Curated annotation (Swiss-Prot):
This is Photosystem I reaction center subunit IX. NCBIfam families: PRK02733.1. Keywords: Membrane, Photosynthesis, Photosystem I, Thylakoid, Transmembrane, Transmembrane helix. May help in the organization of the PsaE and PsaF subunits. The chain crosses the membrane at residues 7-27. The keyword Signal does not apply. PANTHER family: PHOTOSYSTEM I REACTION CENTER SUBUNIT IX, PTHR36082. Belongs to the PsaJ family. It is a single-pass membrane protein. InterPro entries: PSI_PsaJ (IPR002615), PSI_PsaJ_sf (IPR036062). It comes from Thermosynechococcus vestitus (strain NIES-2133 / IAM M-273 / BP-1).
Amino acid sequence: MKHFLTYLSTAPVLAAIWMTITAGILIEFNRFYPDLLFHPL
């Protein structure tokens, strides 16, 4: 278990998890409010 936690705390793994969560939030936001991500200038 200690080695698994060490693996999870490495930078590439944390970056992948963070990008996955961010993409999920953006996808769900875009699903409910499809016009708010692209504001006309």
